[in-house]
Amino acid sequence: MKNLFKYLVIFFLYCGSIHSHHPGNTVEVGEPYPEIFISIYEDSYDGYNIKIHMKNFKFTPEEISYEPKEKEGYALVHVNEIPIGRSYSKWFHIPDRFFNLEKNTIKVAIKNVNHQSLVADHTVISQEIIVEK
């Protein structure tokens, strides 16, 4: 019976975090808080290019998985709540195949080098924009 209980606990912990890259990992940052602004440009060949304007945040791809520094890391790009890739610079291309709804939501959130979401005033720092097809 003890083993069954252990397996059930492991199963529910796994299923509860199956859609999370790193479940429950957030870190509160101090002021001035990082800010994100998104510009979107239709690509002449396929999809869209987004420009991620950052304030009080530095992209540091060379530091991934090292000791985190406040307000440094990367941006995680989502389309319709599905994470599609990391951005280590201000430009990111999203192919047309990700835009399968009439109204599509692009969300950009920032993470530190240990993959923790950055939080200001108990809210994950992110920005969203709607793309209509």
Please give the residue ranges for each predicted region.
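Contiguous beta-strand segments within globular domains
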Residues: 41-56
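Short, well-structured beta-strand segments within conserved domains
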Residues: 48-52, 99-112
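Short amphipathic, basic-aromatic surface patches that mediate peripheral association
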Residues: 53-67
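Short beta-strand segments within Ig-like beta-sandwich modules, predominantly Fibronectin type-III
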Residues: 83-89
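Short acidic/polar inter-strand loop motif in beta-rich domains
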Residues: 85, 111-119
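Exposed aromatic-hydrophobic patches
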Residues: 91-98
